[in-house]
Design a protein with these regions (language model features):
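A polyanion-binding, active-site-adjacent surface
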Residues: 1-136
Length: 138
């Protein structure tokens, strides 16, 4: 269940469509927790994990209408090599491939969001529209 703020201001998260396995699949880049680095931050997903099983999982989901690629590992897997910044800036081109490129949600991105106001002004509204369309489709 989302945080209290999201529940108070957003859609009714209790609706069954948010938990309908035929509509939404959250597929991580690794099915393990890779641990912490020396400073206590989460380590990125090991490339071996996605190399081992990701293609099979994605093939088992043939009717995907929208892929939200969140973070560098997911962006590289879905869109190929490149900087997260460049892939997110090129979100319209990525949408042509059926992929919505997003930075990893983190407090570390606060400064990036302030330097890139287009993200919340342009990308986020389009993301909301696309997600709503997928969830409301019958």
């Amino acid at each position: 269940m989302p945080a209290a703020t999201a529940c108070a201001t957003g859609p009714d998260w209790r609706q069954t469509k948010f938990y309908d396995l035929t509509r939404v699949a959250i597929v991580p880049m690794a099915f393990c927790f890779p641990g912490y680095d020396a400073s206590g931050s989460d380590l990125p997903p090991p490339p071996l994990c996605a190399a081992t099983w990701r293609a099979g999982v994605m093939a088992a989901l043939p009717a995907l209408r929208l892929v939200l690629a969140v973070g560098g590992a997911a962006l590289r897997w879905h869109l190929g090599p490149g900087r997260v910044q460049d892939q997110v800036i090129g979100w319209r081109a990525a949408l042509a491939q059926g992929v919505f490129p997003l930075p990893h949600p983190s407090w570390r991105n606060t400064a990036w969001l302030k330097r890139n106001p287009w993200f919340e002004a342009e990308l986020v509204p389009e993301l909301r529209t696309r997600v709503r369309a997928v969830l409301e489709a019958e």
